Design a protein with these regions (language model features):
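Intrinsically disordered, low-complexity, charged terminal extensions of DNA damage-control enzymes
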Residues: 1-25, 191-349
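Catalytic cores of DNA base-excision repair glycosylases
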Residues: 2-9, 13-202, 206-215, 219, ...
């Protein structure tokens, strides 16, 4: 397919059939707010559009500009992010907002080289912001785009070899103007027509040029990578409750998983356990509440949940500890895993 023809077909289709999403302007003539694209791309990392939409709307209402976000308290940012998962993104979004506001005069970089220097921004996110927010002539490859191109050209490749070939093809097809529309158009074709398991070739604007259109073999592309089986981890979570039925949480100061968030004491499942010195408490009763199961990107977790009822007169809290009422959990930066644990514990009180 000639370079110009592919971009023309996709752009013309997109202008008539784009998905209505809260981070997209309703009018193609309207100037795109880079902050809106910046925020949406952080949220869309490893998360579906359907899941992101309500979180994006709520987040943007509270933090409508990058300056307001940079001035916010990290705890508040993490709290409104709670439930979306992959919490390191929220920490990195906040760090990047601080850098942009304090060091770059509040101006989001419009080039790949400067964007990729910011916390939490890798190759894909930098390219996506450049293309969508600033209409730069860069190649963007997400799962949808990779699937569309692999089927369009019937690429019998997988993994890095596939990505390299897709990049070569797109490099020859990226238009000098309206790359923002071209990129989003390819994404939308993949998301609405050329899906992983459902393919609607009748509706696809590229079907006349697609090498696997209307063929049963289309669903086999892109060729699958054999994934390693997830490892299983086990451990213990401790739910300490006082007479007011408030639950003890720790502020996690460890880097990595659940950084800067409120967590329950635990051991056995992480290298850096969320430890607590139980000797500072007088424990009246102990109950085994059962097992909690939770899936992470690289491992599955099966852990015991232990309820400890405390003697209020013997409680001396450290600075990183706080008692929280179950009905107030949403006011704090508490990951979904711990909401599940509390729900299990409350059944045993």
């Amino acid at each position: 397919m000639q370079s110009l023809k592919l971009s023309e077909i996709v752009i013309n289709w997109y202008k008539k059939n784009l998905r209505i999403l809260p981070w997209r302007p309703k009018d193609f003539d309207l100037k795109i707010d880079p902050y809106i694209v910046f925020l949406s791309e952080f949220m869309l990392q490893q998360t579906t559009v359907k899941t992101v939409v309500p979180y994006f709307i709520n987040f943007l209402k509270k933090y409508p500009t990058i300056e307001i976000l940079a001035k916010a308290k990290l705890d508040d940012v993490l709290a409104i992010w709670s439930g979306l998962g992959y919490y390191r993104r929220a920490n990195n979004l906040y760090k990047s907002a601080k850098i942009i506001t304090n060091e770059l005069n509040g101006v989001i970089p419009n080039n790949y080289e400067d964007l990729i220097k910011l916390p939490g921004i890798g190759d894909y996110t930098a390219a996506a912001i450049c293309a969508i927010a600033f209409d730069k002539k860069v190649v963007v490859i997400d799962g949808n785009i990779e699937r569309v191109i692999s089927r369009l050209f019937e690429l019998d490749l997988r993994g890095n070899d596939l990505k390299k070939k897709v990049r070569e093809i797109l490099f020859l097809n990226v238009p000098g103007k309206e790359n923002s529309l071209f990129t989003q158009g390819l994404m939308d074709i993949g998301a609405t027509i050329c899906k992983p398991k459902i393919i609607n070739c009748e509706r696809c604007p590229l079907s006349e040029n697609c090498r696997v259109a209307f063929k049963n073999s289309a669903i086999n592309y892109p060729l699958k990578i054999i994934k390693e089986k997830k490892i299983k981890r086990t451990g213990n979570f401790y739910c300490l409750i006082n007479s007011k039925k408030e639950i003890l949480f720790l502020r996690n100061t460890n880097l990595g998983l659940f950084e800067n968030m409120h967590v329950l004491p635990s051991d056995g499942w992480l290298k850096d356990n969320h430890n607590l010195d139980f000797n500072i408490f007088s424990i009246n009763e102990r109950f085994d509440c059962g097992v909690i199961k939770h899936s992470f990107t690289h491992f599955d977790l099966d852990s015991k949940v232990i309820l400890l009822k405390l003697d209020d007169n013997q409680i001396k809290l450290k600075d990183n500890c706080i008692f929280i009422k179950p009905e107030n959990l949403d006011m704090f930066s508490i990951p979904t895993l711990y909401h599940k644990i509390v729900k299990l514990v409350l059944k045993n009180i």
